[in-house]
C-alpha cells in the first residue's frame, strides 16, 4: 500500500522541482520513484544515505541530530537546512491526520515538519495509509489548512475525508 501511495505522489513532481521529503516511511519510498527525475530533494530521513545514488536526482541530507527511533535528523541543524531552502512541493508521512490537525509520534520531528510545510510554496502533501486518517498521534505538527493534498487509500475515515475536502484539501485515493 505504501509503495502505491509513494508512486502516486511521485507523479505530482515536475522536472526541476525542489522537493522536501520528511522522515516518514511512506515519504521515504518516494526516493525510489524520483531517482531518475531531474529534481533536487532535501530530506531529513537518515535512511536515505543508504539508498543507491541517483542517476539524475540530487539528494541533499539536512544534517542534524540523529533521532534513533525513526532514523531521522532533527534539531537546529535540520531546521536550519530547511529554513535556508524553498521547495516547490513537499511530502510528509505522519502519525495521524484528523480535524485536530497533523500529528506525529516523535516530538523532535514536529518542528522540522512544520518548517518543511512553511518553506514550501506549492503543493504540501500528506502521504499516509488510510488507518492513520481520522487518528491523532502524540504531538501536533500543524493545522490541516497548511496542506493542499492528501494521498491515501480507501480505508481512510470518511468523516475526516469530508472535513479535509470542505477546507479545500484535494484528496487522492490509490487502489
Each language-model region and where it sits:
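HTH-adjacent hinge/linker in prokaryotic transcriptional regulators
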Residues: 1-25, 31-36, 52-57
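Short, contiguous clusters of charged residues that form electrostatic/catalytic patches at enzyme active sites
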Residues: 3-7, 11, 28, 76, ...
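Short glycine/serine/threonine-rich phosphate/pyrophosphate-binding segments
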Residues: 27-30, 134-136
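Conserved phosphate- and dinucleotide-binding cores of soluble alpha/beta proteins
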Residues: 42, 46-175
Amino acid at each position: 500500500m505504501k509503495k502505491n501511495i509513494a508512486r502516486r505522489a511521485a507523479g505530482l513532481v515536475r522536472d526541476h522541482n525542489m522537493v522536501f521529503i520528511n522522515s516518514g516511511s511512506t515519504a521515504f519510498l518516494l526516493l525510489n520513484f524520483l531517482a531518475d527525475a531531474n529534481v533536487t530533494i532535501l530530506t531529513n530521513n537518515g535512511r536515505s544515505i543508504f539508498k543507491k545514488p541517483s542517476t539524475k536526482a540530487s539528494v541533499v541530507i539536512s544534517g542534524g541530530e540523529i533521532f534513533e527511533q525513526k532514523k531521522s535528523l532533527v534539531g537546529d541543524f535540520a531546521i536550519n537546512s530547511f529554513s535556508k531552502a524553498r521547495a516547490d512541493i513537499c511530502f510528509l508521512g505522519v502519525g495521524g491526520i484528523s480535524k485536530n490537525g497533523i500529528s506525529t509520534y516523535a516530538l523532535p520531528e514536529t518542528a522540522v515538519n512544520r518548517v518543511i510545510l512553511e518553506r514550501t510554496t506549492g503543493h504540501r502533501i500528506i502521504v499516509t495509509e488510510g488507518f492513520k486518517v481520522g487518528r491523532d498521534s502524540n504531538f501536533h505538527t500543524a493545522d490541516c489548512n497548511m496542506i493542499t493534498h492528501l494521498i491515501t487509500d480507501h480505508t481512510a475515515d470518511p468523516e475526516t475525508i469530508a472535513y479535509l475536502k470542505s477546507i479545500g484539501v484535494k484528496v487522492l485515493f490509490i487502489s
